[in-house]
Regions:
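Gly/Ser/Thr-rich beta-alpha loop segments that engage phosphate groups in nucleotides
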Residues: 20, 24, 81, 106, ...
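Extreme N-terminal starter segment of soluble prokaryotic enzymes
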Residues: 5-15
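Alpha/beta enzyme core
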Residues: 31-34, 86-115, 123-164
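Structural preference for beta-strand elements that scaffold enzyme active sites
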Residues: 14-16, 39, 72-76, 98-100, ...
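Short glycine-enriched loop/turn motifs at secondary-structure junctions
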Residues: 11, 68-71, 112-113
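Glycine-rich, positively charged N-terminal anion/phosphate-binding segment
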Residues: 2-5, 20-93
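Glycine- and other small-residue-rich loops at beta-strand/loop junctions that grip anionic moieties
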Residues: 18-21, 77, 118, 122, ...
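Small-residue-rich anion-binding loops in enzyme active sites
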Residues: 14, 19, 159
């Protein structure tokens, strides 16, 4: 995998607000920043939703609500299609400080569309996604789980792929 040296943002504190669906909207993130969070995560956003609302990025977007005053910020995305994930990430490149690929969510509705921890069952596809994402100028991080079950632990394999 071709790797570029990318700068992760310097944090004002070690407190990090994790992504929480239905909770970490822009108002809550701004409040947490005021209360000392060094960086905040957005709620996770599907690559399909980002692509659907691409013409509204930077305006009153119902999906991507990052504002300059809250930065640094991490935008977490999920999906299952290599090209769609890349296209969605490209839309927010430079508008967020880190793009985090969610490969850990076990929610049935996310698994049903092949996203989240479903990607742990196809490490070749995950590698292709990360190779594409690594061509962007924005730093990439990956949220993972140990595996899909106690007998299928793949965390070290995923970490090696992500490190490449």
């Amino acid at each position: 995998m071709v790797s570029m040296k990318k700068q992760f943002p310097k944090l004002s504190s070690s407190f990090i607000l994790a992504p929480m669906a239905g909770v970490t909207n822009v108002a809550f993130r701004m409040l947490c920043r005021e209360m000392g969070a060094g960086i905040c995560y957005t709620e996770f956003i599907s690559s399909d939703a980002l692509r659907k609302y691409k013409d509204q990025l930077g305006e009153d977007n119902p999906i991507f609500d990052v504002v300059e005053e809250e930065r640094p910020v991490v935008t977490q995305i999920f999906g299952e299609d290599v090209d769609k994930i890349f296209e969605a990430a490209k839309l927010i490149e430079g508008k967020t400080d880190i793009i985090d690929l969610n490969v850990g969510c076990p929610a049935p509705k996310v698994l049903a569309c092949g996203g989240g921890s479903a990607l742990l069952t196809d490490l070749d596809k995950l590698k292709k996604i990360l190779i594409r994402l690594n061509t962007l100028s924005t730093p990439i991080s990956v949220k993972i789980r140990l595996g899909t079950s106690e007998s299928k632990i793949v965390a070290m394999d995923v970490a090696k792929i992500a490190q490449e």
